[in-house]
Amino acid sequence: VIICWTVTLVHSQEVLSEWENPEINSVNAEPTHASYIPYRSVAEVERGESSMVHSLNGKWKFKYISGIEASPTAFYSVDYDDSSWNYINVPGNWQLQGEYDPPIFTNVKYPFEPNPPYVPKDSNPIGLYRRNFVIPTDWKDEEIFLHFAGVQSAMYVWLNGEKVGYHEDGMLPAEFNISKYLQKGENQLTVQVLNWSDGSYLEDLDYWRLSGIYRDVFLFALPKVHIRDFSIFSNLDTEYK
């Protein structure tokens, strides 16, 4: 009797987290566009104050975790107890605002053992940020966007316990349309910032390695129908003027 065994080899592809997947730079984020501030009137432009923008800069609740695998679960839930968290100034780097991991300066050498697209897990610090806000009363029937001008090096965003999205690129803004996540009255915003991501391999420049929400954070409102992006083109004459 001859027994034939048929062996089927199944190749299982590893599922990478967004922060270790070179094919994913953002999830549910708005497409990159020209930078601008919306205004309701010429008078607002002349004053330099827009009623369509609401700053979220200031004191945020903050929790430092030495490695992403040590991150608490459900920290984004609205009923999660953050009474033991510290406060931190936004914008700002956490290395410069407390006894957290130190700033790192290196030129050619990576600040961690390179194994692209992977980054260390046990030594990849994260910062948990949280703050509450109320939407201005005159923002009715408009699209509401959340703008981060700069976060290093990657982040996840939750609003009122619901996951909004992900973004990595420490030098470019990130925007999310949060209209469907908002509720009447007070809203709770939670952000998880990762020190390292696969983007850190491309951002390995001759400069200080600092982390956190280091540029402005604000909300802005736009009408349902609006200009989202624009470009300006000009031609040069024969003298390149």
Regions found by a protein language model. Give the residues of each.
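Surface-exposed, low-complexity/disordered Ser/Thr/Gly/Pro/Asn-rich loops and linkers
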Residues: 88, 92, 97-121
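Bacterial Sec-dependent N-terminal signal peptides
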Residues: 1-14
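Accessory beta-strand-rich segments of carbohydrate-active enzymes
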Residues: 14-26, 30, 46-47, 61-65, ...
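Short Gly/aromatic-enriched secondary-structure transition segments
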Residues: 71-82, 88
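Contiguous beta-strand segments within globular domains
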Residues: 236-241
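Mature N-terminal segment immediately following signal peptide/propeptide cleavage
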Residues: 47-64, 78, 87
